[in-house]
Every structure is written in C-alpha cells, then in structure tokens.
Amino acid sequence: GEDDATGNIELTLVDAATGDAIDYAVALEIREGANNVSGNILKEIAVEASANGKCAIEELPIGSYTIQVVSADEKSEIVAAPFSVTVIAGQTITKPFSVTKIINDDQIRFVLRWGDEESGAPSDLDSHLVGPRVKGIGNFHTYYSDKTYEEYDDEDGYVKYADLDVDDVSWEGPETTTIYKQTAGTYRFYIYDFSDQEDEESKNMSDKSGAIVTVYRGSTLLNTFSVPTGQSGNLWHVCDYDSVTGRVTSINTVGYWPNDGSSTVGMSEAEVLRDSLSRKISDIQDYDFVLADNAYKANMKTVLAEAENLADNSENMDDIRAMIQKLEEIKNDIQSVGTIGNVKLDGEYVDWETIGDEDHYIVNGIRIMGVNNTPGEIEVAFTNTSDDPLEVRSEDVSGQDYIKVITVTNTVS
C-alpha cells in the first residue's frame, strides 16, 4: 500500500557548543540522494524556536536524502551543514544532529558525532586536540581530563586558546572542540576509543561507530571526515590543521595507542617524557605544605627548580628521564615514612592516633592520647612498608627536624 512506500524521520537538533537542544529557529532543506547539497530542493521545513530542536518529517518516499540545516533568521546564524539519511518503508528513523553557530573567522571548531547504543557503537569516543603552546617548548593537549588550554597575559589575564566545549560519554555526541585563539604551527585532531582502549585488535570504532567529524571556520563548513572502515585500533588520527596556511589536511588513519594512553594521545616520545616530568613535579609540589621547613625540604625545592627548568627548556631526553627517576625517589622517600611504628613520651610508650592529610593520603601528624599537660621529649619510630624500623628520632615538640611535621596536642580522648 501507499504507507509501505514511505517512511518517517524524527530529528533532534542540538547546539554543538553546549550539547543542549537548540532554542532558536532553523530551516531544513531536503534534497533527493545522498551528499546532495546543490540540487533541487524537494521540501523546505521551518523548525520554530519553541520546538526545542524537535522536528518530524513524515511520509517521505523510501530512498536516500540529504538534509541541510540552514539559518532561519539573523538570530540563529548557524553554519549550513548537511547530513544524509535513508528512509525505510514503514519505519521511523530517529536522528540526532548537531548545529554549530557561526564562530569568528579566526576560530576553528571540530564536532564529533557517532552511533547510538542500538547500533553497537562504542559508548565513549573522546576528542583530543594537540597543538602549539604560546609559551615554552612542546604542545598543549585538550581532552576530557584537561579540557581547557589557557595562558596568562599581563594585560588580559587568563586567555583561552582552545577548549573541549562539550564532552559526551554515552553515545552519539556531539563532542565539540574549538580553537578560540590560534598560535602559529600545526594542530592535530584525534578520536580515541575509550570504550575499547584495552583491545589492540578492536574494530568497533572503525566498523560500528559510524563516527563523523565536521570541521568549521567562521561561517564555513571546511571538511567532513568519516572514520575509515575495516581498521583495527583505538585511535583515529582525523586531520591536521596548519594555522599559518589555514589548510586542513586529511590524515584519516586508525591505529593502536597503548592502554591508559588518554593523557599522551598524539604525543611524540619527547612530549610523553615531558608530560611525565610535569606530572611528577606536580606530585611533589603537592607535598610542600605538609613538610617541615628543614634541610630536606630546602633540598627538595632545589631539585624541583631544576626539574621545572628541564621541563621548560631541555631537549636532552636522558636528563629528563634521570630527573623523573629522582623525583620518584623523593616521592617514595616521603611516603615511606608515612607509617608510624610507635610513640614514646619521656621514655614511656603512649597511646596515639594519626592525623591524616586526606588530600594526599599521607600522615602529617600524631595526637598523643590522654595528655593533660605540656608534653616533654617525644620519640617517634617510623617504619617502612616492610615493617622494618626505618629511623627513630628524638626531638622536643617544638623541633622541626622531621621530614613531616609532627604535631602533638594535649587533647584528651
């Protein structure tokens, strides 16, 4: 019958910059055939602002169509963007689509979309942008754990250069990454299959995700990339963008990036080492406020200054590796004395409890139980992880020779 020769489409239009349903009017131009953006328009549909991005297209003859979303008025000012859809007899196709508003002419936007749960697509694909830093050596890297790259400027304060505007962890997208302020150099854009990161032979991103990346500049749709099929791996290198020439170059390859590689996606060996050194520096800096002001701490600060200089300026990978090892030893040294074996007050064993620094999971003090007056000489025996005595230190309560500050109170418990 007539109904068997037609099908329906239900659209949900979301704003690529927020991930929310659009609250402005747009227009749809429907053309016959896939990837057809210049032929005769079969049907035009207005989607009102009050529709919250919802639109039903009913009783379309079976076949393939291209639907182009365009601005309805000056308020919407969106970048015209097409997508293809196949109408199946007697069925209603549900389709989410991301709409991007016109951005500045010197801004670049990458929008990722992929399949839904029913399609068997991976639930979580992640967008990664690697690009040149404004200051210092190396590249910045924006992704779900470090969404914004910004630098401090004396006149303007913190300036945002790139941002993962929208992060989606449960199918479809959109995930949106924008270069807000360009720096001379090459930007590399990747998609990482977080769902299948442990499976080197997985083809889920390649064959099941249906992932598409659209690239915009200003009011122009520059490129549309589809993930290559039949490829094993968890990392899709989509494209490179040269900010000097303004050219987007298709890379479009899928390969494997090691498990737990989210923080290092797209980095060279040198960049991975610098990233590791920066994280070690951050780890040690976190201990600064729980350490006593003594020779040990002063030496640690000297080493940290050397490490920061290497991270910013050195091209010698052996020096960076050696510094990473040195900082790891400092961290182990601090943590190894976190277990207290026993406490003596004026030569007598006493009951005590630890005072922990919850932010860093270390002990930074003790409380002696049942003390009502000012304590005298204390002895604290630390042990290492194998419970062998590490060191016994005898010090007046006001002393500052401990690696960690030991605080003694007269609290009665």
Regions found by a protein language model. Give the residues of each.
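A short, solvent-exposed beta-strand micro-motif common in secreted/extracellular proteins
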Residues: 61-74, 187-193, 307
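A short, amphipathic beta-strand motif
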Residues: 7-16, 108-112, 341-345
